[in-house]
């Protein structure tokens, strides 16, 4: 440290000397309100053919009122990352982001003001927002955040996902959190909700997607939410075990290996290993004072199953065993005396078995519905889901690659999904099949494209992404051109 000090003094002296010879100019290099640094953009809201707003890194807000020919910098008065934006009309809208940030604009994105809310107090990130009208909006985010305003954002009502005593995750909570649940206090579910969308009035349908394959649909603008179901074609009959036997028979090993091979490359699919014991085994080995003999049997059968799956190519981190033996059950008994009894009851079946099934838990980024019935979802690993019944059930469609697809939308009979490293897929049959876009329909893009949207007439649309990139279409997505940054200007470079 002593040796480096003269260097710092020299640098300071040089700075003073230069300042004495040349007047330093700290004035902006571009007019106020114009874009100087092209930050990463994470979301865009397209109001009509003329008006759109995009938001992103370090509080970046860009707005246009001439169809995207010129973009201007809005005054967000924050350095927080902004993950989503939704405009109710040409003047009013919201943006949400880091640590519960909610911003409101009443002048088309030119200026914004912060709206206090409970998620800001909790420090929970907000990932998605949808403006139903100038007074009503939903926002979603981490820790199951789901909040609603009906007064323009003056107040926000908490409708977040919480854990109850009968919730599957209750037993995995810390003891203090379990006690909070018993006392009726809120303990939020550890899941991120990434996107929310609603159809325009008079429809009252809305949808939410997020981590772990979470999909919700509502028929009453979010008054009630119901879970959607992802349908899969990979199933397997249970592995049966004779009394007090832990080895899997050769025929069952073959079936299990064949099951694993079907999903080996579908890394968004995990495997549930669910053990059950017969009434006889429970009576002989499941003593309340000493359950460890039964625990040993269950654990050995689980380990056998895991071993076969691993040999067939399923990594251990894709296996889920929520009902494995609770070896630390005594830690729970003082607060929950019936804990072990309920575990035994939940593991009892007519015959000892291991049920192996697929857990549909893809990481989902964006949901889009063109009408009340037909919808699309994009996600991590090239996931595309399609629904024909308003979001009640979903099926996988093949995108052809495993790169992330961050956003999906449809216009004029053409569905488009965009993602990382310039990954684009197009469908002209309502999302049933996907292929590369035609040559020359997109400019060369090698960075991420984070969001896309169209105006209501489905002609003008924008894609936003890394280094302030904005692509525009004027023909419903057939042809896209770059409008930002101008020329070769990119992130961190000044005009």
Regions found by a protein language model. Name each.
Residues 2-10:
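Bacterial N-terminal signal peptides that target proteins for export
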Residues 11-19:
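Bacterial N-terminal signal peptides
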Residues 21-236, 254, 265, 280, ...:
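Residue-level hotspots at or immediately adjacent to binding/recognition sites across diverse folds
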Residues 234-243, 286:
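Acidic/histidine-rich, surface-exposed loop or edge segments in extracytoplasmic proteins
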Residues 241-281, 306, 310, 359-361:
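Periplasmic peptidoglycan-binding/anchoring modules of Gram-negative envelope and division proteins
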Residues 247-251, 290-301, 359:
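Extracytoplasmic/periplasmic, Sec-exported soluble proteins
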Residues 265-269, 281-288, 300-362, 369:
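Periplasmic OmpA/Pal-like peptidoglycan-binding modules at the C-termini of bacterial envelope proteins
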